[in-house]
C-alpha cells in the first residue's frame, strides 16, 4: 500500500531511506526546525533495527512494565509517552504506527527508515561512502538527495547541503499529492 494524503491518509507521509551512517537523522533534524518556522507541524516515525530502552531501571514506569503491564502511559504537564510492549517480535508496520499518532496536531509525518515499505520517500545517497543506489530497486522513491551532483538521474535531485531546498521540494510535493 502506498501512503498518500488523498487515498490512505489525511496528512502527507514522506519517508527517508538510506544506508546506516548516511545522515538521515542529521537531515531530518535540519528540516524539522525549518518546517516549524513556516508553521508546519511535523511528526516523526523512526525505525530502530535494534533494541532500545526509553525507560530507566528503578523508575515506576519501568517497574510497571517489568511487572507485566502491556502498556504504560507516562504523563506530565509538558509531554506524554506511551510505552507499548509487543507481544510478538515482528517488524513494525508503518501504517499501524501512523494510527497511533494524533494527526489532528500534525501537518506532515516524516518517516526515517522502513525503506522496504510502500511509502513515498526520498533516497539519501553519498557517493563518497561507496554504497550502491537504492533506486530503482526500492519502491516509492520520488527524489534523491546527494552531497555530490548525480549524472543521468531520472528523479529530481536535491542537494543534501541545502535543507531549505529540500523543504521547498517537500512543500511542493505536499501541495501536489
Which role fits each region the language model picked out?
Residues 109-111, 121-125, 140-147:
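Short, hydrophobic beta-strand segments that form beta-sheet elements in well-ordered domains
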Residues 49-50, 79, 115-117, 129, ...:
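Conserved nucleotide-binding/hydrolysis micro-motifs of P-loop NTPases
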Residues 32-89:
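N-terminal phosphate/diphosphate-binding loop that engages ATP/GTP or pyrophosphate donors
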Residues 85-114:
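Phosphate-binding/switch loop-helix module in NTP-utilizing enzymes
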Residues 115-137:
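Conserved C-terminal guanine-recognition region of P-loop GTPase G domains, centered on the G4
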Residues 2-50:
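Walker A (P-loop) phosphate-binding motif
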Residues 116, 137-177:
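Conserved NTP phosphate-binding and transfer environment spanning the P-loop NTPase/kinase superfamily
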Residues 14, 43-45, 70-73, 122, ...:
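Hydrophobic/aromatic beta-strand patches that form the interior of the parallel beta-sheet core
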Amino acid at each position: 500500500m502506498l501512503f498518500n494524503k488523498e487515498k490512505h491518509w489525511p496528512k502527507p507521509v514522506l519517508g527517508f531511506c538510506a544506508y546506516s551512517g548516511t545522515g538521515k537523522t542529521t537531515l531530518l533534524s535540519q528540516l524539522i526546525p525549518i518546517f516549524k518556522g513556516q508553521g508546519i507541524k511535523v511528526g516523526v516515525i523512526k525505525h530502530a533495527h535494534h533494541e532500545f530502552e526509553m525507560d530507566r531501571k528503578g523508575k515506576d514506569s519501568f517497574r510497571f512494565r517489568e511487572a507485566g503491564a502491556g502498556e504504560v502511559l507516562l504523563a506530565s504537564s509538558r509531554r506524554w509517552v506511551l510505552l507499548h510492549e509487543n507481544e510478538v517480535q515482528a517488524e513494525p508496520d508503518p501504517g499501524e504506527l501512523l494510527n497511533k499518532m494524533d494527526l489532528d496536531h500534525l501537518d506532515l509525518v516524516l518517516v526515517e527508515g522502513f525503506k522496504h515499505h510502500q511509502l513515498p520517500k526520498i533516497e539519501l545517497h553519498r557517493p563518497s561512502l561507496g554504497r550502491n543506489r537504492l533506486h530503482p530497486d526500492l519502491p516509492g522513491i520520488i527524489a534523491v538527495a546527494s552531497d555530490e551532483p548525480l549524472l543521468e538521474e531520472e528523479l529530481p535531485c536535491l542537494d543534501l547541503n541545502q535543507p531549505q531546498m529540500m523543504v521547498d521540494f517537500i512543500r511542493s510535493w505536499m501541495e501536489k499529492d
